[in-house]
Structures are given as C-alpha cells and as structure tokens.
Amino acid sequence: MTQDELKALVAQAAADYVLANVPEGAVLGVGTGSTANLFIDAMAPHKARFAGAVSSSEASTRRLQGHGFTVLDLNEVDAIPVYVDGADEIDASGAMIKGGGGALTREKIVASVASVFVCIADGSKLVETMGAFPLPVEVVPMARAAVARQLAALGGQPRLRMTKEGQIYKTDNGNVIIDVVGLRIADPKGLESVVNEIPGVVTVGLFAKRGANVLLLGTEAGVQRRDF
C-alpha cells in the first residue's frame, strides 16, 4: 500500500474507535495535517451524532466547517473525551514529535484537555529514537535569534522555517517556527522541559509529558493498535 492508502486506513480506524468509544453529544478534539484531514472526512457522515469539534488549526476548522461540523472555541468546552491527531514521529513510549504542519501550540493545548489522545500514523512514523524529523519550536518573533543560539547550544542546528515563496513562516498565532535538525532525543520529557524553559519559546513540538494513549498504526498487514 502507498503511504496515502495507509493514512486512509488509520483515519478510518480512528473514526471507528471514536464511534465505538465516544458517547453521542460529546465534543471531539481534532488535530491538523494530512492524516487528520482524512479522519475529518471519515467522520463527516456521523457529524450529527456529536455536539461539535474543537479544532487545532485554522486549516482544520475550514475542513470541518466544509463538512458541516459545528466548530467550538475551546473556552466554550468543559471536556473532550478523545483528541485524534497524527505525528511526525512517535516512539515506543507514546512520546511524539509534532508540528510539521505548524500547529504545535494549539495541538498541545487541545490535547492537554482531552481524556484520550489517539495518534494515527503510517508505519514509517514509529521510530526507536526520535530526532530524524526536525524538531519544531514555536517562538515569539523578537526572540528568534536568542532562542536559536540556545537551541544550538543543546546540540541542534536551528533553521528558521520559511514558506515556499521565501517568506518567514507564521503560525496561526502570529509566531515563527525554528526547526531543529541533528538531535538524537534520548530523553523526550527532559528535552521538552529544557526547551520550554527558554525565554521566548511558546512551546516545543515534543509531546512527551502528554503523549499518546492509543496509537493506530497503518502497516501492510493492516492497522495495529498500541496502548500506552
């Protein structure tokens, strides 16, 4: 199967998980990216069953609304039973690198409210040690040079994210992203704490302190489920 076919497979598996485990009238938490988009599409026929969804990005909001979902502000919501999102990398403990799509801060906020984080990914995303995928760090613009120096001191090579048009990439929150390459992340929780303490960092795309509870992994043999 192609990577796109594997993504579609796990997206449908996530929809099946939600339908089996989330009560009617609940609010869904929805992530960002190509796999999350397929999950949104798979849930579209069942939108009337739920009170609405909390989205982690403007892009996901547009896709949800295009399917007729009610998109709620997180401040209006008391509880989210399940948050479904993809990952750029995930290890055997359920820790993840996220933020390749630029929505890491809102993803981390929505995930923190959810009772269960369901990660959906194709088999290539499961790794022994994270760091091959560049680690995204959302940064207040005025602090980007200072933060980059501190990230370099940690052993990484910081690179300011740019758009295809050559402009500085801006998040939905108006901040910039520094992608750090060359890291071998042996202690995800420790590195998450260290980077988040750098003044000017909004958040780092390490989801270790609040990792996945369930992984639905698309493989040639079908969808494998892992619980953490």
Curated annotation (Swiss-Prot):
Alphabetized InterPro entries for the sequence: NagB/RpiA_transferase-like (IPR037171), Ribose5P_isomerase_typA_subgr (IPR020672), Ribose5P_isomerase_type_A (IPR004788)
Annotated protein name in UniProt: Ribose-5-phosphate isomerase A
Single GO cellular component term: cytosol
Pfam annotation, one family: Rib_5-P_isom_A
UniProt GO molecular function: ribose-5-phosphate isomerase activity
Function (record text): Catalyzes the reversible conversion of ribose-5-phosphate to ribulose 5-phosphate.
TM stretches of this protein: none
Enzyme class at the top of the EC tree: isomerase
Binding site for substrate: T32, G33, S34, T35, D85, G86, A87, D88, K98, G99, G100, G101, K125
Active site: E107 (proton acceptor)
EC number of the protein: 5.3.1.6
Pathway connected to this protein: Carbohydrate degradation; pentose phosphate pathway; D-ribose 5-phosphate from D-ribulose 5-phosphate (non-oxidative stage): step 1/1
Species name: Ralstonia pickettii (strain 12J)
Family named by the database record: Belongs to the ribose 5-phosphate isomerase family.
Subunit structure, interactors included: Homodimer.
HAMAP family: Rib_5P_isom_A
Keyword set, alphabetical order: Isomerase
GO biological process per UniProt: D-ribose metabolic process; pentose-phosphate shunt, non-oxidative branch
Catalytic activities: aldehydo-D-ribose 5-phosphate = D-ribulose 5-phosphate
